Amino acid sequence: MQLCYQNTQITKLVNNWHTQGKTVAFVPTMGGLHQGHLSLIDIAKQKADKVIVSIFVNPAQFSKNEDLDSYPRTINADLTALKVNVDGVFIPNIKQIYPKGISKYIDVGKIGQILCGRTRPHFFNGVAQVVEILFGIVRPDVAVFGQKDYQQLLVIKQMVKNLSLNICIESGEIIREKSGLAMSTRNQYLSKNEAKIATNLHKTLSYFKHEILQNKKVYVLNELAKLDLKQHFKIDYLEVLDANNLKQITDNTHQIVILSAVFLGSVRLIDNIIFKKG
């Protein structure tokens, strides 16, 4: 495993692999690695000859009142987890990514203005900005993202299409704790009791899916699910949308996604369930 701290180092490494006819898969992360990240690396290993992981806590996707300063930074544990799994790790500092400061704007379109984009209007611009920069530095053939951040996944796919980037975007399913809680770096913020309460998010979404498949009215189910969630959380959103484009479902919708973001105390949790209509 090769460690690269400079843009020139990682670019040279990947160029050498490409010269040898090797394909390269890329898994961008902010560190705080868990089994969910490792599952994406497993997919990357299946899709390419070489795998690069980046660790960079991106300030552009945090607003002033969010957890940039307290976001878990566990670089030693992360490198231990990666040692036998990847070929290279890119650990840039902020000057490598934003040499002229954070100023570039990427229009992510309507898909970035709904759901998380409504209450975190800065977020997807920041994500798209850093991902485009990382793609330009690493120049992978394949990049792998998790479905837990489903809206982010679609935003990145749209960005790649808009910019005509020759990168195949792959996705990995949500990895869950035995309790059903979706694995997330921010789960470290939860107390033991809060972690138990947090499992109710997935339980509610699972029941919502079950009832949709019984052909019950979605708008009625949505209100009932919100009542259920309000017993445990402060709701940011709960919506049922077309999984292909995050538009409202119709009779012609084949794949559905139920998405939700909630607050448990100060911790923001997101989750989703994707399924075929039946």
Swiss-Prot record:
A GO molecular-function descriptor: ATP binding
Keyword terms of this UniProt record: ATP-binding, Cytoplasm, Ligase, Nucleotide-binding, Pantothenate biosynthesis
Binding sites annotated in the UniProt record for ATP: 30-37, 146-149, 175, 183-186
Residues binding (R)-pantoate, per UniProt: 61, 152
One of the Pfam families matching this protein, by short name: Pantoate_ligase
UniProt pathway: Cofactor biosynthesis; (R)-pantothenate biosynthesis; (R)-pantothenate from (R)-pantoate and beta-alanine: step 1/1
Active-site residues annotated for this sequence: 37 (proton donor)
EC numbers on record: 6.3.2.1
Family: Belongs to the pantothenate synthetase family.
Assembly behavior: Homodimer.
Protein name: Pantothenate synthetase
Gene: panC
